[in-house]
Amino acid sequence: MKQNFFAVDLGATSGRTILGTFIEGGLNLEEINRFPNHLVEVGGHFYWDIYALYSHILDGLKLVAHRGESIASIGIDTWGVDFVCVGKDGNLLRQPYAYRDPHTVGAPEALFSRISRSKVYGKTGIQIMNFNSLFQLDTLRRNHDSALEAADKILFMPDALSYMLTGEMVTEYTIASTAQLVNAQTRRLEPELLKAVGLSEKNFGRFVFPGEKVGVLTEEVQKITGLGAIPVIAVAGHDTGSAVAAVPALDRNFAYLSSGTWSLMGVETDAPVINAETEALNFTNEGGVEGTIRLLKNICGMWLLERCRLNWGDTSYPELISEADACEPFRSLINPDDDCFANPADMEKAITEYCRATGQSVPEKRGQVVRCIFESLALRYRQVLENLRSLSPRPIETLHVIGGGSRNDLLNQFTANAIGIPVVAGPSEATAIGNVMIQAMAAGEATDVAGMRQLINRSIPLKTYQPQDTEVWDAAYIHFKNCVRK
């Protein structure tokens, strides 16, 4: 009997539910519903509408139930670091802050006045970023946030949604790891860091790893959806963790680039890599599936283009890519990770002002802006990959690009040109596939990640890009390093 696995995949700009089924040695994915996920600005702060997300999940479940399809289990993955405060009565205390809220500007330095940067990094191995949950929690504590002061439990986004479905509170390993609250060696919540932000382990749900059962749908949810007591399985709750599980690699000599709103570039390791070099380069050691560590760097990704598109009206990606392809190469370059691009009111204006401030030609038309973004991302990928090579325990012979960005032919070719090794693109639905994979492993329908990767490699169309014009890109890389602000 075939088993259907219901995957909830929520990103920072959109979400969807997907029904995954294994058929004849392959995997079939069917999108059930797709919906936007927007920042909500109120009173100078940015929030996520978790009730809307919950409602969209219920809509997806109702659609499957209406068709008479059975569901073996449900798994939820989301973006990282954001969380919900839950009161002693079990109610959510307010909508969760979004990680792009400006209240965490300067937050790391405030915490480091009490516990050193080196100690925080040494315990967690996590890249220092303003919006990490550790710094969000410390900011709320310092600001006497009423929700945090009244909170009995802190639930990260995937865990909050599974709680709303099941009534069970858990803390899933991969999402807690990226929060900068997990000790990289013990793979458990780190008491000293929790104490530093006024919390303890009792403020979090039962600690679980990918593949463990959270609970079953509450009677209320069963009544609303028309479904039975379906189990909810903890997948890799951090979407990157689920995506990397689905990299279609046949050996371990690869790096991955999970390409979406964020670009996350890294390698898999068997143990954390925490030393002076990784700290200086600000690399992160995030928890993965089957005991692996994802040694990676967060890079600003398609956020740059997504925000530009807000002011460009109804434009398609193929249209923008075509315009960029027709423009002069290397006219303008930016550092995609410059703070000025974190959440500007006008992204195109931020890019042009950056180019002007660094003495470059200013993009004058839309295609030039897009080309600037793509070339800058490709060159930034090269910069990060060079650092990654020095840290990786294995040689890097191929870059696997997964996620929505894997459909961008122009950026993929630029990336191959810049890094000088083959780029293998696909699957674009890596996060949903990884989510389904982990559920299937929990159900006994799949054995291990290595076997699942081989199945994906056989059954999902992939495209390989060979490096071209490498001498031109080598020269551009020198220019990139000289002209961009660090």
Whereabouts are the PLM-identified features?
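Short, well-ordered amphipathic alpha-helical segments that serve as non-catalytic structural scaffolds
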Residues: A52-A65, T186-E192, R380-N387
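Active-site core segments that coordinate phosphate-bearing ligands/cofactors
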Residues: K2, A7, L19, F112-T124, ...
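N-terminal glycine/serine-rich phosphate-binding loop of ATP-dependent small-molecule kinases
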Residues: M1-R94, G122, Q222-V232, I419-I421
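Carbohydrate-associated surface elements
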Residues: D101
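Short glycine-rich phosphate-binding loop at a beta-alpha junction
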Residues: S70-T78, K153-I154, R206, L391-G403
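Short beta-strand-loop/turn "lid" adjacent to the catalytic site in phosphate-handling enzymes
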Residues: K62, H66-A98, Q127-S133, P158, ...
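Pocket-flanking alpha-helical
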Residues: V84, G106-A110, A243-A245
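Glycine-rich beta-strand-to-loop/alpha-helix junction loops that act as flexible
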Residues: D77-V81, P210-G211, S259-W262, T398-S406
